[in-house]
């Protein structure tokens, strides 16, 4: 006998592998989408889409082949574990009745039952995963055509259309196609296949045990939230042969052997041996009634255990959907050559990261209030990739990238609110800075010529007043690209060698002009020094000015610091003729 609680969770590790496969497929689709390029003449465009779809089909087949071995190993493991557990549970009942115990590894018959069900389930899962290639290819073509239509009608820009296509593909997720034409999510299909396979394997073992021992009665397990057609027979004793009139016949009453009956599709009920006169029923009528009682309170309403479980599953599905979107956006960011598309995807990534944080917080609160367990087994597994992007293993990890993006998004929203403090004159000064004023005013400051500086004094007074109203409410990290000569830590004309650059560690950088930074690494061409600056909570004198920037520079996500900005260099590394400096702003 396998307990309903065990059957609810035993496949989590396998489903984590499925989630990783889905993630890889979505990333592959996103890569193809961002490489489609601008909209071209229609017939040529269709040819490009079909070519991309063909390549994606091969991508998916490759991904499936990379993961199938791990999935097969996990299927074998869960079947073995469940088989041993099932017979151990049965042994307790048989020993109490004076019957001998049967162990899995000592029974050739039991091993054959297990092996047959393992083989059947592996074949079913393999066939289902292969159909994802067809469904993914179809989803890609649909997404491309929708994007093309949006751009051609003038309703959307190219960047927004592609970003929408990535979102739609990710939300749809990886799907499987059954021979009947029915379509399901890959994780749902795999869970159904392995749950049904493991449960039927245990049931066949139990009936074999009954046959060998001469026992003619079984008791079904019970759980809250059983479907109505199953609730009528759960937790009751039946006669297997149907010859004992004191008990209802097993097959006719439970529908065992049919998809809709006991141990059928997605069923978590099982059964165990029962010896009349010796065994004690596991479930009283009071216990069965309690399973359907509305005894759990949440937000001032009463719910059954089943209703709460469905509410939790719903929230978990939303979290997985958000993570799929993050995967799509992240892959697009890494693979696009378009700065505007990268900016659009980055903004969406940060927004979805914040949404993920809210969803996870809501789920944890729900579990805490209802006394349910917060499940994280599926959320902690990710694929390990080699240098060519092939899946070569699996590991456990927290999605740190999404965590940091969420924090960055929150910081940006807090800083946006600070712009409300600015006067109209100050807002105009900031906007002018993002245009031509930046070059003019900084040139005056760097020149040191009093006449040039005096000419800009009134403007700088207003700009300084605006920047003084900006205060960092939580630690942020900003980026700045420059060249060695602009670091202002060695005398003018000093030749910067690699050794000299390493000597910068521990030194303080001071910029006498205004300092433009960004929430993201823009990687300006011709600038071989990248500064990553940590700005502590409480720092005063900077504003996040994206919403005030002129259109040309809105995608830079600029954080502007007032003149005299100082930071201390903590670390410096060189990679491919580019220097990466980590620094900390000085309060």
Residue ranges, per PLM feature:
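N-terminal leader/targeting and assembly helices and adjacent pre-domain segments
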Residues: 1-164, 286-428, 432
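Short, Φ-rich (hydrophobic/aromatic) sequence segments
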Residues: 1-21, 75, 79, 190-193, ...
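Conserved aromatic-histidine-acidic binding/catalytic patches
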Residues: 41, 48, 52, 150-157, ...
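Contiguous, non-catalytic segments that form substrate-binding/exosite surfaces or channel walls
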Residues: 126-213
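A general structural signal for short secondary-structure junctions and capping/turn motifs
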Residues: 167-169, 182-185, 207-212, 218-221, ...
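Acidic, glycine-rich two-metal-ion catalytic cores of nucleic acid-processing enzymes
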Residues: 184-288
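Compact mixed alphabeta submodule
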Residues: 254-305, 549-587
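Mono-ADP-ribosyltransferase
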Residues: 402-587
């Amino acid at each position: 006998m396998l307990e309903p609680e065990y059957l609810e969770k035993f496949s989590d590790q396998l489903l984590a592998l499925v989630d990783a496969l889905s993630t890889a497929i979505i990333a592959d689709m996103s890569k193809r989408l961002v490489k489609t390029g601008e909209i071209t003449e229609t017939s040529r465009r269709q040819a490009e889409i079909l070519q991309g779809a063909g390549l994606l089909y091969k991508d998916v087949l490759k991904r499936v082949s990379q993961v199938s071995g791990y999935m097969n190993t996990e299927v074998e493991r869960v079947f073995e574990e469940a088989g041993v557990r099932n017979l151990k549970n049965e042994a307790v009942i048989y020993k109490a009745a004076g019957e001998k115990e049967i162990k899995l590894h000592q029974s050739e018959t039991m091993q054959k039952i297990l092996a047959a069900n393992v083989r059947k389930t592996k074949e079913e899962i393999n066939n289902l995963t292969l159909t994802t290639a067809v469904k993914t290819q179809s989803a890609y073509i649909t997404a491309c055509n929708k994007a093309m239509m949006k751009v051609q009608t003038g309703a959307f820009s190219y960047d927004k259309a592609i970003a929408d296509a990535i979102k739609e593909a990710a939300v749809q997720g990886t799907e499987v196609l059954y021979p009947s034409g029915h379509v399901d999510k890959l994780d749902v299909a795999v869970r159904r296949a392995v749950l049904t396979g493991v449960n039927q394997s245990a049931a066949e073992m139990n009936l074999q045990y009954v046959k060998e021992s001469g026992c003619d009665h079984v008791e079904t397990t019970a759980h809250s939230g059983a479907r109505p057609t199953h609730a009528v027979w759960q937790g009751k004793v039946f006669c297997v042969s149907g010859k004992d009139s004191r008990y209802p016949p097993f097959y006719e009453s439970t529908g065992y052997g049919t998809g809709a009956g006991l141990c059928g599709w997605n069923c978590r009920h099982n059964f165990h041996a029962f010896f009349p006169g010796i065994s004690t029923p596991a479930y009283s009528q009071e216990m069965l009634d309690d399973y359907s009682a509305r005894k759990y309170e949440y937000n001032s309403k009463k719910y059954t255990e089943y209703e709460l479980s469905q509410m939790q599953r719903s929230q978990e599905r939303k979290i997985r959907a958000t993570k799929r979107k993050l995967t799509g956006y992240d892959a697009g960011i890494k693979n696009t050559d378009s700065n505007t598309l990268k900016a659009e995807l980055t903004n969406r990534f940060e927004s979805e990261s914040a949404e993920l944080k809210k969803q996870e917080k809501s789920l944890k609160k729900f579990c805490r209030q209802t006394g349910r367990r917060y499940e994280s087994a599926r959320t902690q597994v990710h694929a390990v990739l080699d240098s060519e992007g092939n899946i070569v293993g699996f590991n456990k990890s927290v999605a740190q990238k999404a965590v940091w993006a969420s924090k960055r998004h929150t910081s940006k929203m807090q800083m946006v609110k600070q712009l409300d403090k600015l006067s109209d004159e100050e807002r105009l000064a900031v906007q002018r800075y993002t245009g031509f004023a930046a070059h003019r005013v900084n040139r005056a400051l760097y020149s040191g010529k009093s006449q040039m500086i005096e000419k800009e004094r009134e403007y700088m007074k207003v700009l300084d007043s605006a920047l003084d109203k900006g205060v960092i409410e939580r630690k942020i990290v900003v980026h700045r690209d420059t060249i060695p000569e602009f670091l202002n830590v060695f005398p003018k004309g000093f030749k910067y060698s690699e050794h000299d650059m390493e000597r910068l560690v521990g030194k303080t950088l001071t910029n006498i002009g205004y300092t433009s930074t960004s929430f993201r690494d823009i990687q300006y061409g011709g600038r071989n020094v990248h500064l990553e600056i940590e700005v502590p909570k409480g720092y005063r004198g900077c504003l996040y000015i994206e919403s005030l920037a002129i259109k040309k520079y809105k995608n830079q996500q600029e954080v502007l610091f007032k003149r005299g900005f100082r930071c201390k260099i903590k670390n410096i590394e060189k990679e491919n003729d580019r220097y990466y400096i980590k620094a900390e702003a000085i309060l």
